[in-house]
Structure formats: C-alpha cells, structure tokens
C-alpha cells in the first residue's frame, strides 16, 4: 500500500525537517552508534538486538567480516583478524613493535614508516580497518533510522594527539561519513550524564575502556560543560587486564612459548574469566587442555598496579583543576572495564564517594555523542548547552637560546586562537624559522617537536624593528594550525601540524612528571639562557656600532676600553653564572653609555643637516 503525505494547504509536510545524525563511539574493544529519536538518545541495535559491535575486522580469503563474525575468526585465523585497531591509529610501526611486541599480525612499514597489516585480502592500514568498522556502524544507523546520515560525531580519547585525530577523521571520510565534530570521550559521557541528572558542580569522569584510560575533571553549571583538566594514559585499559590474566594462565599451564592460535585462546579465556568474576568470586577455566580456577582475589592482585597508575592520574588531574577530591560531587564511570568490582571500590575510596553507574558504562559515550550530533545537525536550535574541551599539553614556540615561549598553556579550553609578536635578532634578517613545540619544560630540547617552517620575505631592517605576529589556532577537534605574518608587508606562512605518528604510551605522563620534577632546574636553565641571549644581543650591537662609528667617535684608549668590556662579557656569557652575566651586561652598558650618546648626537646632526630652523 502506498503511503500518502497529508499536510495543510500551502504548508510543507515537514516544516522543520529533522536531519538524521548519529553519535559514534569508536572504541578499542567495542564500538557503538546512537541517535536521538523522539527526543531521547539511545543506542542502535543490530538484527539480534545487540548494541555493541566488537571492534574486530577479519579479512578472510572469502569475505570481509566485521564485529561478532570477525571475532569468531580471531582464534582460528589470527593473522587476518585485526583486534584493537584503535591502538594502531596514528602510530609508527617502530612504536607499535616496541609497545605491542606480541601482536599476531604480519606487519610491514609504509614509505613513511606507518604500519601496514598484511592480510589474505592484501595490505590494510589502520585507517582502512577503522573505516570498515565505521561503515558497519553507519549501515546499522541507516537501516534503523530509514535514511542517510547528515553527519556524525565521533568520540576519541582525550589524550589522542593530532596524528591520531587526523587518522580518525580520515577513516570516517573513507567510510563516506561527514564528521560534524570529534568529541573527547569523557566529555561525551558528561553530556549524557549532565542532561539526564541536571546536576551542577564538579564532576569526575573516570573512563577505563578496552585500550585507553582518561580522567576528566569537569564543572557543570547552567548548561555549560567546562573541562577543568584532563589526564590519563593512551594505552592502558581492559585489554591490559586480559593480557595480565593470560600471562598468569600461561605460567600456570607451564608453557614457555605460544603459537598465535594459543595466544588468542589464552586471551579469550582471560577475557571470559574477567567477565565471570564481575558477578562471581571464582571462575572455572578450561583452556589448552588445562583445567583450573581463577579467583577474584588473584585478579585484584594482578590489576592493582595498573589501577594505582590510574589513581595517580586522577590525583594529578585534580591538582591541575585546582580542586580537592572532597569538592567532587559525583564520579561518573565510563567504559566496560569499570564493571570490575575492584575498580569501582578503588575509585570510590579515592574520591570518598560511591561512583555513579546508573547509565550503562558501555553506552554512555555513544549517547552523549548522539546528543551532541543532534545539536550540531541543527535539530535543537534553542539548545543552550555550551561545550568546552581543553588541550592536554602546552603549545609553544622556540625563541633564541633554545627557550620555549608558551603560546597556549595546557588545559586551555578549545577551540582557541592565541597570538604573540616576535621580532628579528640580527640586522638585515630576511627570514625567520618557526619551531612549534609541545610540552611543559622551559627548554626546547626537553619538549616534543611538532613542526618547523620558515617565514621568508621579511624586509631587511635593524634587529628588533620587524614585527612578526605568530598565531596558534586549535580547532574544536584539537588540531593545530600555526600562522606567521610580517605586519609591514603582509608576507605570511602557515602550517597545519599533523605529526606522522603519535606520542608513545608514557610520554604524556612522563612529560608532566618531568615538568614538576625539574621545575627548579628548568627555571635556572631558562634564566641562564635568557641572560646569554641578552649578552649576545649587547655584544653584537656594540661590535656593529664600533665597526660603524668607533674610529670616528672614539679615541684609541676609549676604543680599547670597550673592546675589553666586550671580551669580559663574552667570557662571562660562556660561563654558567646567570647573575654574573647579568652584572656583566650592566657593566658593559655603563661603559658604552658615552659612546651611545655620541652616536645619537651624530644621528641628530645628520638628520638636521641642510634644514633651516623654520623647516624644523
């Protein structure tokens, strides 16, 4: 039977056309898709009523399988079955081999050193594999909602760097999806929780998924979601629990080496044991011909060191946010790994309150993303919710002496644009090198280099006369672009920062630890470098002045006095005493004051020559 569209005469049958939008939680272990229907956000299920899609792709010789069918192939066809591909996104093959030496895949490197998985269907890179997962989720959404998606919001860990975010967007484009926004996973959870409860105040979002851990401290007030601070580990999650259990079982069985099939069988047994121990005190195991029990106490002993790492990140995030644990009103639990009773107990003890688990921890991120997608698609024009994310590490620029000038401090809300003016160091300088760095330390050598580019075409001027405006802009997805503009000519250079691969697992945490551990040494090193730069400026300026006017304006004795002052300052500059260099600069300035006055008089006389008093 044909359906008739009925509307008032002269009025569209859909005066306020609802655009189809979805939120996608592209997870390490599992992925989900959700959408707002009839004003309520909910996850979309497959034909068997399952909301979760395992983040697994099998490239068999006969077909490509995604989700549950792919996971079934993991044990029998490990080389062609890719699990936890999210851990490979935006990383180099060298980094992957160092961090995950036991992966069963056959890797080779691309020309840029990025990983390629060799499968029965040919070479596949992490972006292509992720795209296949996104396609499966998009097909589910299209079938459920009855039309093509106008756009999606995809969630990423808060600690994903530029390369990992770009790779996620590239995967979405390959899947034919229009990305409305990338959204930090803890922030998505805050959206879902905040709208459901109407709570106001400081909230901690503890997100322990399959492959990543994030802690976010947020303030919810009158519809405004502000991330006060973030922390975490981009490679710590439930997968690590599984591997610890598998290693324990391997020792129990007495196996010294494993085939890929045996390794996968152990991982599967470990995962099932972890799930069983969520409800029971013991788990019965039958794997590789070995039968035995695994207790909740054994599990807790194994995972305690990893949980301690997450709580250290929580303590650091609270310090960054400037709040105490007792100021946190609620703790939101996100990620399937938070179902483990020991995790909930430890987090509850740390914050001094029972964590909230009323929203399904597997679904909360996708639901929050769906709510945000609905707003960005224009379906809620009156929505008052304002979302503010932050950058996890400071972004800066190298200045003379190897110093770092921070342009955007860490935990600044994004999107954001900040600019500073810089100038030339040498007379006649016509180009400037811009070195973009990331980190909390005072010296360039202690920070992470992101990119370099040059601004050419600066008009030749005296040192310090040119004005170069350097602008750092971070968009809503956390991607950075840097622009350098010479103000008098309009000459401009720009670069988008897209590193070839991301930070190693412990680099972010280590960078923050180092910034605190070496704070005093860094400030002393910075003070020394600053005095050396100033000494170089004074020396170069005075040498240039002597070459230009020394013979004309100074006696030989005066000239020798200044040369001795320069030599003394050079000697001090090459030393390690910042205070001595500072005093040497003052002494040199004092010794050259009379010479500077004579040069000024000469310049004035030259400017007035040939002009009458009336003209002046």
Curated annotation (Swiss-Prot):
Iron found in the keyword field: no
Cystine residue pairs: none
Entry's Gene Ontology BP terms: iron-sulfur cluster assembly
Pfam families hit by this protein: HSP70
Keywords: ATP-binding, Chaperone, Nucleotide-binding
GO molecular function: ATP binding; ATP hydrolysis activity; ATP-dependent protein folding chaperone; unfolded protein binding
HAMAP family: HscA
Family membership: Belongs to the heat shock protein 70 family.
Function: Chaperone involved in the maturation of iron-sulfur cluster-containing proteins. Has a low intrinsic ATPase activity which is markedly stimulated by HscB.
Protein name per UniProt: Chaperone protein HscA homolog
Source species of the chain: Vibrio cholerae serotype O1 (strain M66-2)
Gene name in the database record: hscA
